[in-house]
Amino acid sequence: AQAVPHMPVDVKDLDCDFLAFSGHKMCGPTGIGVLYGKHHLLEEMEPVEFGGDMIETVELECATYKEPPYKFETGTPIIGGAIGLGAAIDYINKIGYDFIMKQDQLLRDYMLQEMKKIPGITIYNPKTDTGIVTFNIDGVHPHDAATVFDQENVAIRAGHHCAQPLMRCLNQVATVRASTYFYNTKEDIDRF
Protein backbone atom coordinates (compact mmCIF):
# COMPACT_ATOMS: atom_id res chain seq x y z
CA ALA A 1 0.00 0.00 0.00
CA GLN A 2 2.90 2.34 0.69
CA ALA A 3 5.30 1.55 -2.18
CA VAL A 4 3.32 2.45 -5.30
CA PRO A 5 2.98 6.18 -4.54
CA HIS A 6 6.71 6.49 -3.85
CA MET A 7 8.50 4.29 -6.38
CA PRO A 8 7.94 2.40 -9.61
CA VAL A 9 6.57 -1.08 -8.96
CA ASP A 10 6.58 -3.85 -11.57
CA VAL A 11 4.50 -6.84 -10.47
CA LYS A 12 6.22 -9.06 -13.04
CA ASP A 13 9.70 -8.19 -11.74
CA LEU A 14 8.50 -8.73 -8.17
CA ASP A 15 6.72 -11.95 -9.14
CA CYS A 16 4.21 -11.15 -6.40
CA ASP A 17 0.98 -13.07 -6.06
CA PHE A 18 -0.95 -9.96 -5.02
CA LEU A 19 -0.30 -6.24 -4.69
CA ALA A 20 -2.68 -3.67 -3.23
CA PHE A 21 -2.58 0.08 -2.92
CA SER A 22 -5.00 2.84 -1.97
CA GLY A 23 -5.89 5.73 -4.21
CA HIS A 24 -5.69 8.30 -1.43
CA LYS A 25 -2.02 7.52 -0.79
CA MET A 26 -1.16 8.78 -4.26
CA CYS A 27 -3.19 12.01 -4.33
CA GLY A 28 -6.38 10.24 -5.41
CA PRO A 29 -9.79 9.96 -3.80
CA THR A 30 -10.62 7.86 -0.77
CA GLY A 31 -12.71 4.72 -1.12
CA ILE A 32 -10.88 3.28 -4.11
CA GLY A 33 -7.70 1.35 -4.67
CA VAL A 34 -6.14 -1.35 -6.77
CA LEU A 35 -5.78 -5.05 -6.11
CA TYR A 36 -3.52 -6.88 -8.53
CA GLY A 37 -3.58 -10.65 -8.44
CA LYS A 38 -2.04 -13.32 -10.63
CA HIS A 39 -4.76 -14.52 -12.96
CA HIS A 40 -4.55 -18.19 -11.96
CA LEU A 41 -4.97 -17.25 -8.29
CA LEU A 42 -7.92 -14.99 -9.03
CA GLU A 43 -9.52 -17.84 -10.97
CA GLU A 44 -9.26 -20.09 -7.91
CA MET A 45 -10.79 -17.53 -5.54
CA GLU A 46 -14.49 -17.37 -4.83
CA PRO A 47 -16.28 -14.01 -4.73
CA VAL A 48 -17.26 -12.71 -1.30
CA GLU A 49 -19.84 -10.22 -2.56
CA PHE A 50 -22.56 -10.88 -5.06
CA GLY A 51 -24.50 -8.63 -7.38
CA GLY A 52 -25.07 -7.49 -10.91
CA ASP A 53 -22.44 -7.68 -13.63
CA MET A 54 -20.37 -10.40 -11.97
CA ILE A 55 -22.65 -13.31 -12.82
CA GLU A 56 -22.52 -15.39 -15.99
CA THR A 57 -25.60 -17.55 -15.25
CA VAL A 58 -27.88 -18.10 -12.27
CA GLU A 59 -29.86 -21.24 -11.44
CA LEU A 60 -31.94 -21.91 -8.35
CA GLU A 61 -29.13 -23.83 -6.66
CA CYS A 62 -25.96 -22.54 -8.28
CA ALA A 63 -24.39 -19.74 -10.24
CA THR A 64 -21.44 -19.30 -12.52
CA TYR A 65 -19.35 -16.17 -12.47
CA LYS A 66 -17.54 -14.13 -15.07
CA GLU A 67 -13.80 -14.42 -15.49
CA PRO A 68 -11.55 -12.39 -13.20
CA PRO A 69 -11.46 -9.54 -12.50
CA TYR A 70 -15.15 -9.12 -13.34
CA LYS A 71 -16.35 -11.81 -10.94
CA PHE A 72 -15.16 -9.60 -8.07
CA GLU A 73 -16.84 -6.41 -9.31
CA THR A 74 -20.41 -6.33 -8.04
CA GLY A 75 -23.05 -3.73 -8.66
CA THR A 76 -22.44 -0.17 -9.71
CA PRO A 77 -18.75 0.70 -9.58
CA ILE A 78 -17.40 3.82 -7.92
CA ILE A 79 -17.22 5.67 -11.23
CA GLY A 80 -16.15 9.04 -9.82
CA GLY A 81 -13.49 7.35 -7.71
CA ALA A 82 -12.14 5.47 -10.73
CA ILE A 83 -11.92 8.68 -12.75
CA GLY A 84 -10.20 10.40 -9.81
CA LEU A 85 -7.74 7.54 -9.37
CA GLY A 86 -6.95 7.61 -13.10
CA ALA A 87 -6.28 11.35 -12.88
CA ALA A 88 -4.05 10.82 -9.82
CA ILE A 89 -2.04 8.15 -11.64
CA ASP A 90 -1.64 10.49 -14.63
CA TYR A 91 -0.52 13.25 -12.24
CA ILE A 92 2.06 11.01 -10.56
CA ASN A 93 3.36 9.88 -13.95
CA LYS A 94 3.62 13.51 -15.09
CA ILE A 95 5.62 14.46 -11.99
CA GLY A 96 7.74 11.34 -12.41
CA TYR A 97 9.07 8.80 -9.97
CA ASP A 98 12.63 10.12 -10.33
CA PHE A 99 11.56 13.44 -8.79
CA ILE A 100 9.34 11.76 -6.19
CA MET A 101 12.12 9.41 -5.06
CA LYS A 102 14.71 12.22 -4.87
CA GLN A 103 12.32 14.39 -2.86
CA ASP A 104 11.49 11.45 -0.55
CA GLN A 105 15.20 10.85 0.06
CA LEU A 106 15.97 14.52 0.69
CA LEU A 107 13.07 14.98 3.11
CA ARG A 108 13.59 11.64 4.85
CA ASP A 109 17.27 12.36 5.47
CA TYR A 110 16.46 15.81 6.81
CA MET A 111 13.65 14.51 9.02
CA LEU A 112 15.85 11.77 10.49
CA GLN A 113 18.73 14.22 11.04
CA GLU A 114 16.47 16.64 12.91
CA MET A 115 14.63 13.96 14.91
CA LYS A 116 17.90 12.43 16.13
CA LYS A 117 18.72 15.78 17.78
CA ILE A 118 15.67 15.49 20.06
CA PRO A 119 16.18 13.47 23.26
CA GLY A 120 13.54 10.90 24.14
CA ILE A 121 12.58 9.89 20.61
CA THR A 122 12.99 6.26 19.59
CA ILE A 123 13.13 5.82 15.81
CA TYR A 124 12.25 2.27 14.76
CA ASN A 125 13.41 2.51 11.13
CA PRO A 126 16.47 4.79 11.09
CA LYS A 127 17.72 3.23 7.84
CA THR A 128 14.46 3.54 5.92
CA ASP A 129 14.52 3.86 2.14
CA THR A 130 11.18 5.67 2.09
CA GLY A 131 9.78 8.93 3.40
CA ILE A 132 8.07 7.06 6.25
CA VAL A 133 9.57 7.37 9.74
CA THR A 134 8.12 5.34 12.61
CA PHE A 135 8.87 6.49 16.14
CA ASN A 136 7.71 6.93 19.72
CA ILE A 137 8.27 9.67 22.26
CA ASP A 138 9.34 8.53 25.74
CA GLY A 139 6.48 8.82 28.22
CA VAL A 140 3.90 9.85 25.61
CA HIS A 141 1.30 7.45 24.26
CA PRO A 142 1.31 7.53 20.44
CA HIS A 143 -2.37 8.49 20.32
CA ASP A 144 -1.72 11.42 22.68
CA ALA A 145 1.13 12.54 20.43
CA ALA A 146 -1.20 12.30 17.43
CA THR A 147 -3.78 14.47 19.20
CA VAL A 148 -1.21 17.18 19.95
CA PHE A 149 0.15 17.10 16.39
CA ASP A 150 -3.42 17.34 15.07
CA GLN A 151 -4.12 20.38 17.25
CA GLU A 152 -1.12 22.00 15.58
CA ASN A 153 -2.44 21.05 12.11
CA VAL A 154 0.31 18.50 11.54
CA ALA A 155 -1.03 15.29 10.05
CA ILE A 156 0.65 12.15 11.33
CA ARG A 157 -0.65 8.67 12.07
CA ALA A 158 -0.66 6.73 15.34
CA GLY A 159 -1.61 3.14 16.01
CA HIS A 160 -0.53 -0.29 14.94
CA HIS A 161 -0.70 0.68 11.24
CA CYS A 162 -2.37 -2.61 10.27
CA ALA A 163 0.83 -4.37 11.37
CA GLN A 164 0.11 -5.90 14.77
CA PRO A 165 2.75 -8.66 14.37
CA LEU A 166 5.36 -5.95 13.81
CA MET A 167 4.17 -4.08 16.92
CA ARG A 168 4.61 -7.27 18.96
CA CYS A 169 8.10 -7.67 17.50
CA LEU A 170 8.91 -4.07 18.52
CA ASN A 171 7.29 -4.72 21.92
CA GLN A 172 5.01 -1.73 21.38
CA VAL A 173 1.23 -1.40 21.37
CA ALA A 174 1.41 1.45 18.88
CA THR A 175 3.80 3.86 17.21
CA VAL A 176 3.69 7.28 15.59
CA ARG A 177 4.30 7.45 11.85
CA ALA A 178 5.33 10.56 9.96
CA SER A 179 5.35 10.43 6.18
CA THR A 180 6.66 12.83 3.59
CA TYR A 181 5.65 13.13 -0.03
CA PHE A 182 6.84 15.16 -3.00
CA TYR A 183 4.70 18.17 -2.04
CA ASN A 184 6.27 18.49 1.43
CA THR A 185 9.08 20.91 2.21
CA LYS A 186 11.87 21.24 4.77
CA GLU A 187 9.71 23.94 6.39
CA ASP A 188 6.99 21.32 6.90
CA ILE A 189 9.52 19.11 8.68
CA ASP A 190 10.76 22.01 10.82
CA ARG A 191 7.15 22.66 11.85
CA PHE A 192 6.71 18.96 12.63
Identify the residue ranges that each predicted region occupies.
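Pyridoxal 5′-phosphate
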Residues: 1-192
